[in-house]
Amino acid sequence: MTIVLLVLGLAAGSYAYANTQHGSDQFGDGPKMAQGAPPDGQGGPGGQGPGGTPPDGKGGPGSSSADIDYSGAVEIASKETESGKTYASTKGDQSALLVATTDEVTITNPTVTKSGDSDGGDNSNFYGLNAGVLVKDGSKTTITGGTINTSANGANGIFSYGGNGGQNGADGDGTTVTIRDTKIVTTGASSGGIMTTGGGTTYAYNLDITTSGQSSAAIRTDRGGGKVVVDGGKYTSNGLGSPAIYSTADITVSNATLTSNLSEGVCIEGLNAITLNNCNLTANNTKRNGNATFLDTIMIYQSMSGDAASGTSQFTMNGGTLTSKSGHVFHVTNTNAVISLKGVTIENKDAESILLSVCADGWQGGSNVATLNASAQKLSGAIKVGSDSQLTLKLTDGSTLNGAIDGKITNAKGSTVSKEVGKVSVTLDGTSTWTLTGDSYVTEFNGNASNVISNGHTLYVNGVALKGVK
């Protein structure tokens, strides 16, 4: 079965580590797949968005048109139930298993192996070419148990492509992958564990995923977005520009262990969202990728590559643990972001102990604006807001902050980013407190001054020392 898709006018760049690369590696070294290199480890298409490549990387502009010939070593084109079968491909740009049907397909205990590199970044990153398992055309496919192993560049483990042609915000064709109790291992670049694009949907339960290549998030999405729901399991990424989760979609993860051993733990690009419920997230971001000039655990940005629509990015975490071994815990740049935390245990092991930075980085064209909502939450560490940036901080329901707010910011390259603080609004409800660890500077303060514990320091509101603090 040969399916030809004409793709028109792809435009994009990538973040510091895009999922794939479009001719240039946004993160720096590494294979030059077709996407651009975003922070999460993805490359950008051959060009770079206004600021260059996006962090986690999503595709960039790509070619003006592309003909995609889909093929699979095994192809399913109608309703099917299979159990205990082996699906293997060693041919470039061929999937081990291609499911292209509007019907329901059920697969139990498969053994999937895929080698043979993809020739093109956009085709493998946006449309599913060369995946271990590719599901498309509106199929409802359920996979239970078994293993999926890929050892090629541009070879995502399982790919749900929703058929919207990479149009962000457009509805997909109903393609839905439900996968549970499966072990997935990928070793090549631009090879995520579970991949969702084009308005596809993925439900994943109790998976064991390990990725090792650049731009290879364990839970990965790209242009056209979609919906991803994960419950249970372990998700580990080891490569450059490869966060545990890279979001250009709506992603909810519950009761899971998420680990990134080189890159950010989570990357959100543009008008997209990640919600973590009772998860344990650990990141050790020790190497910058692409345009990124900071090291961080939660990276929220807009690459302007075209992989994600511009708008408010949202990161929500309820319960669980967040362990940041290197760099800033949260970093917001070139976008508007809302961070909501409730009852999360945060452990910041970095010597500088910076909780949040909102400032310029390696991308341009957007603003640096963040809102941090903390409910029943303990926060500790410095908050840095650049002179061209804005922060709204709200503490409620017995939340506490031990830290200082200022605008003195130096990036991981040692370059000065800001010397003066931007616009900062802080609100404390009657049950929440702020203990200063240094002189702090805000534009607006709402709440009782007595809920601020000076600890020998001064809180300045529009340049005037706040009176009535403890």
Stretches found by the model and what they are:
Residues 62, 67-84, 99-117, 125-150, ...:
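Surface-exposed loop/turn motifs in large extracellular/passenger domains
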Residues 406-407:
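Terminal, low-complexity, charged helical segments
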Residues 420-423, 436-446, 460-461:
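Surface-exposed loop/turn positions within long extracellular repeat scaffolds
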Residues 88-99:
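Beta-strand-rich domains and repeat architectures in extracellular enzymes and scaffolds
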Residues 18-67, 164-171, 288, 304-306:
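Disordered, low-complexity segments in secreted/periplasmic proteins that are enriched in proline
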Residues 1-17:
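Sec-dependent N-terminal signal peptides of Gram-positive bacterial secreted proteins and lipoproteins
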Residues 456-470:
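Extracellular, surface-exposed repeat architectures
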